[in-house]
Amino acid sequence: MSDSQPCSTPSTRGKSDSGYIPGDDTWTQWRNIFAILTGQMTDEGKEQFRIARDIRNEAADCKRCEDQRDYLLQYSPIIRFLSDNIRQLRGDLSSHNIYCRRCTSRKAGGFDPEYGILLCANEMKDQGHLEDTMAHEMVHAYDHLRFKVDWTDNLRHAACTEIRASSLSGECRWAREFFRRGQWKFTQQHQECVRRRAILSVRARPGCKDEAHAEKVVNEVWDSCFRDTRPFDEIYR
């Protein structure tokens, strides 16, 4: 969980070559937004603007994340189902080990067998996005308990659990891909989304040489892992 951060205060230095102007007042924020819209801010400046915004909104983002997390744990069918199945494997995921934090890397969340689930509050778009992210990480938790996943050295294990998490969580359903990610295909959309996300995840692991290596590993386990819908009877959504 090293990429989650406590509260801090953005710099108050003057405008840099990136086009970003530090400051929390409304006028400065509008100047920055205008610079982005008119192409006067570099990618570096946009990243500085994003980080400052996330720091400024951290308390509100985390509070909203925690409220939605607690609601989903109580009322979401998919989250409750996964929680029950994890509990049957003598695991426990609840508000005490599902953490809402500001993350410094661009990701939605993560699972650690020792600590639990991290939800990146500053990356959550809405409650549906949070539900998909929780379900994704809970599938990882289920796999860790059910299949004894080797997270460190076995890329095939990593590829398999990523295939299952992307397929079963709902994050690759057609509406999510169509409206959120601009993927316009109607045929084989679900499979292509799952494969794409699994390759990206494997590619980011230290033991992976390159994208071709990641694709090879995903292809090796694809058939068996994509068909395995446990603990569901079928792909839920």
Swiss-Prot record:
What segment(s) does the record annotate as region Disordered? 1-23
Its protein name is Mitochondrial inner membrane protease atp23
User: Catalytic site residues?
Assistant: 137
Q: Please list the GO terms describing molecular function.
A: metal ion binding; metalloendopeptidase activity
Query: Which coarse location class applies to the principal site listed for this UniProt protein?
Result: mitochondrion
The record's family statement is: Belongs to the peptidase M76 family.
Give the highest taxon in the source lineage: Eukaryota
Q: What is its EC number?
A: 3.4.24.-
Compositionally biased spans, kind Polar residues:
1-13
Query: How is this protein situated with respect to the membrane?
Result: Peripheral membrane protein
Root EC class: hydrolase
Annotated GO biological process:
mitochondrial protein processing; mitochondrial proton-transporting ATP synthase complex assembly
Give the binding site residues for a divalent metal cation: 136, 140
